[in-house]
Amino acid sequence: MATSAVQSAACPPNTFTCADGSCIPSDWKGDGEKDCEDGSDEEAVTGETTTKFDEVVSAPTTPGSDEDCDWGMQQRIDNCSEPIVHFLSQIERLNLKNMSFLTSSEIQSRFEAGCNLMTTYQECVGNQKGCMPDEGVHSWGEVEVFMCQLVLPSVKEHAGCFKSSADPRCDASKTSSSSTLCGLVTSIQTATSCLETIRPETCSSDAIEMLSPIREETEHIVSAIRCVTPEQHASSTTLIVDETTESTSASAEDDDDDVLTTNTSEESTATTAHDEEVENKPALNINMADAVNSLYYIYDICSANYSADPFAAIADKICAKQDEIAKWSNCYQKTLEKEKCAIRNATSKCEALISYNNNLDCAIVTMNDECEVDAQNLVVELQEEVNDLIIAGKCFEDKKEEEKEPVNDGDFHLQSTLPKCTEEQENGALGCLVELVEINKKLTAFANLNFLLEIASPNSTVVEGICSLFARYEQCLSATVFKNSQRCSFASPLNSLARIGLAPICSLDSRPLLSKHRDCFEKLATEADEDTNCQSSLSTLSNTVQMMLQGVHGEALLCKSFYTIRDTFTCGERAVKNKCEADALTDLLSLKTKMTSLGEEEGCPRDPPANLDEIISRPVARPTPVTMPPRAPTAKPLPIPSAPTPPVASSKCSIEDQKKFEECVKPLTSFQPHPLSVIAIPRDIDQACEAFHTFKACSAESNCHPLWARGMSAMFEYACNEANEQFKKVRKCIRETSMIEEVRSCVSDFSRGAPTAACMSSNRLHSCAIPQIQGKCGQDAADWVSNYIIRFANAIDVRCKVGRQLPVGRVVGIGCSAEEESIIEHCAAPLNDIGSRVEELFAGGMQSLIKNINSLAPVFAGACNLTDEFKTCAHFLLEGRTSCVVSSCMVEAGRGICQLSDPAKAIDDNLSCLFGQAQEPKFAQCIRSTISTLKQFNLSTLRAVLPKFIDCTRDIVVAKCGESPIKIMKAMSTPDICPIRPHQAPIVPINQPARVTPTLETVLSSSTMVSTSSESDSESAPEQETEPTVPSTTETTESPSTPTDGCGESGLVEYLQCETHLDQFAFRPISIIGDASKWDQFCQMANQTYIPCVEGLKCKYEPAASAQIGLIDSICNRKITLKDQKQHGMCLSEYTKSDAGVACISDFGKIDQLDSSSPAQMCDGINQVMRCSTSEIEKRCGFDAVLHVFSIHMHWANLFNASCILESPEPTKDSTSIDVNEVEPSRDQKPVVVTKDETTPVSITTAMNNDITESETTQSPPVQSSVSFHIILAALIPFFALF
């Protein structure tokens, strides 16, 4: 048998070198056939030891344990592995589904490039022991000799024969999907088997002889690299043969057969070998209940015998994708370090599937932050396959809770015969309880009515009202909880009580059943005595429900209510037995039996426990916090309410439109708009309104409609039209009030808010200024200003709620989407019910409040129990991943109190002590001057005066009661929104930013000086403070100093020495650094070396020093920006090294960033770079990369020059943008696409970043504006200025 030789200076290991220098597999030597052309492989060779090919490919890959591996050697191995890993990554990109290795010369040439990689690798690592090579290296080591020394030479020599593998009679679909290498090897195995069978004319006898060795070696390779073969009959290969085809095989002599089956000669042997192979595998020692851990140790699992493990079905799924899963090991490692998900072991297949799925669902939350999009998508695909297994196995239908021994902890526990509800069902049921909010009031009516008579009366309004509410509740459960009509046992006893107490009497057949005996029941009602007054005990149900809402012994109270209702039936049973017909007693017993069966089904014992009353009377202890970490909201949202989509500013605004808009708005801004008094001089309101109408007509056809202009227009629309006359009555007082220092501070805070944060900024302004205006100017003025602010906020975001629009006592969302509002409404339903009852406690005047103060404690205690459920349900929103702010002053009032063992007692003690000081003369005087002045006494009006009341009584209360009552009342009385923070989150005042970058006054003043002052004037401005400061109330402006002339030569040398740290990374525009693979090293160097070096300089070159630090900080220390930079970095880096990229950035390198003209030069230079490179970057890297580059360069340009404008990039018509931040479906969230406000003044947008507390939970980098108007900024200063 002849083989074409592959010439080389030295043959690879495990091969035999023929005398003529050609290479053949080592096990061909001495096999009785001359495979070398000179026959040297069959000549006796003394002193030479060879190794069989099958021994090579099956050699162990782990010669030692991890403990024997030196760290330095492992690093060396990893470095030596890089060429092979890179080669395999290129192979993974090949499309082997539509192209065959045996017929495609392109694919063959790709594999030839890797033929010497193992030799190079072995020379690189030398004689290492105990270290684990990369799994890809192991796989290629098994495949290389087979491919390069056997398959490739044979395919080239007999190309015509192997191309016949494309024959339609050969089934090419039977390949492994484990990995590209597995798919390749199994496709060769299938093709050679087929060619051996059909023996096409294009195959010579030499070619036919080559097929069998190749096929046999593929079997070894498939086993060695742990390929998962497709499910097919192991004993035969089926081929579809054309009737006209002549076969040279002896088995094809029968022309009548359409199907030719070639039986494997060693069927039983192969089966036995497979079983032995499975049995010989080591036992599975990886805990697959930890989903991410199983992905990290994928090869260990797939090489183990997991057939008897409950997780075997999952192991089959992940092992089918083992190489693809293994590529993202870094992702799994990072996730394991941070995720804290509950791990539940399993004893059955269904338990394993559900446990794995739940654990993976929890881990995905962390993976979204730590892993690449491709890794996330892979996990989502895997989760979908597990879901398919759950559905196919009917795990949800067959799932039954294992019988548990009763917990002997002294408490009362239900023993329901129903399966436990899932977390999603529990959350859905909590939402349905909203339908029963009014049921408690209706139940109290039974105390004055005859229970049986009302049920038997078809026209009973009480029963009809109760059953109407219950019908809506049941309809909600059917639609959102019991979709498969399978009931479950609720953890919330209120749901169970509703079913026990209401289902029997509200069923369609119950009332007609008793209505037949109404005459008898009516007679019983008129003759009722103490023994037959059965409904009297039902009066306690209202109080029982009240206690259950507070979370007090819910399970025990449920059964107590069940026994009360049953006793009522028993009482009626005795009366009916004595005075009614036998049919009436039978029908009543039928109804009682139905109710009893429901109670026992929900878990109540048939006989009441002897200590039931004692359990209910016990003090309530604060439950231990749940150890299971919060998960993304799994509650099914209620139907999304119809809400108008908030306006989005148009991004298409040409230079001509910008100039036209400047001219239109200039006359209006000359009146100096003000957020409270409309304009700086309110008496000129008529002239200002004329200018506003002119502005409207002028800008009607303009494409430039920035958000701030919309808000300003809404304010003027209100002040100049419908509320003009009212404004003229209160304008003087509003103007005077706006001069007060506290109000001026409010306006300053508002000025730092961007239009995109209008809702939050407007709420702060409203809560801060309205009380002052109300006190100084009266309610009419306060109402006018409140409407004025609301118009501004709603013009920018129609969903925004400000001031009185915020419902009292409810959990609300600020700046939330319709989907987020739906989640809040759903998760907060029980809390909102309690909040509505808090409002009732504050009605009726001060005496009523003091009387009801005892009822406030249990209400708050109930809220404490429900707060944790709410935070778990809405955890995703509370993490700060979106701009949605969840607010509840009631929840914040309970912060700290709810952590005590007895929250009700703590609140009761503190508030009772506070109002117990009413006998103190000074305390009484404080009440008369604040609370007693209220005409309408409710929680909303009380909040307006409580701050003054607290300040007045503080000394007395602290001396007698301590600080706690003050803290509770402050939280309840705050006029601001009360953001709910997740568990253990630090408390940061929402209206006090933790870090302030250059203030609005600085930015505005710099723009003003550009248009109104000389350059020399601006240079004389005082140096800007570097610490966070309260905006000055004077007209003095600030600008950063630029000591470019006073540093001297030594200062320049020190600065340039710091810059050398950047030079080693080839610092440049567009890609920022030359090698995109070194971002981690660059950021480490910048934070540890470069930034401290520059900040330590005695003399800094500004603005170059600050701009350089600001640019690096905005990338390296913002996780999302750094992630995007790494995502696009390789492509951007390659572009900057291309001829086109070099041409675009060459002129930028000529800019002297230390020169006094650098701000203007940098602005022009960055603009030129962006104009030159945008289209090419879009072609190479996509429009997402363009937007990323634009964002960081806009920030860089503004750090040099606050008034710099970059031309906004526009996508080409045929561009396609790939969303690299796609979130998996299980998260229920899609990425928020932020449309940049192209005409927003840069000062406002920069101010937005100042106003928001920067923390680790920030999920998106600050949005930089792309357009700024110098003249508009100069004219708008009075709009935000302090008076």
From Swiss-Prot:
Segments forming a coiled coil: 332-389
Cysteine pairs bridged by disulfides in the record: C11-C23, C18-C36
Acidic residues: bias regions: 34-45, 1016-1026
Transmembrane segments: 1263-1283
Location of the LDL-receptor class A domain: 10-46
Stored SMART domains: LDLa (SM00192)
Predominant location: membrane
Membrane topology reported for the UniProt record: Single-pass membrane protein
KW Electron transport (keyword) present: no
Regions of compositional bias (Pro residues) in chain numbering: 626-647
Protein keywords: Coiled coil, Disulfide bond, Glycoprotein, Membrane, Transmembrane, Transmembrane helix
Compartment(s) where it occurs, according to its Swiss-Prot or TrEMBL record: Membrane
Nucleus is among the record's keywords: no
Region listing for Disordered, in residue ranges: 27-47, 236-278, 621-651, 1005-1046
Annotated GO CC locations: membrane
PANTHER family from the UniProt entry: PROTEIN CBG06905, PROTEIN CBG06927
Protein name per UniProt: Uncharacterized protein F44E2.4
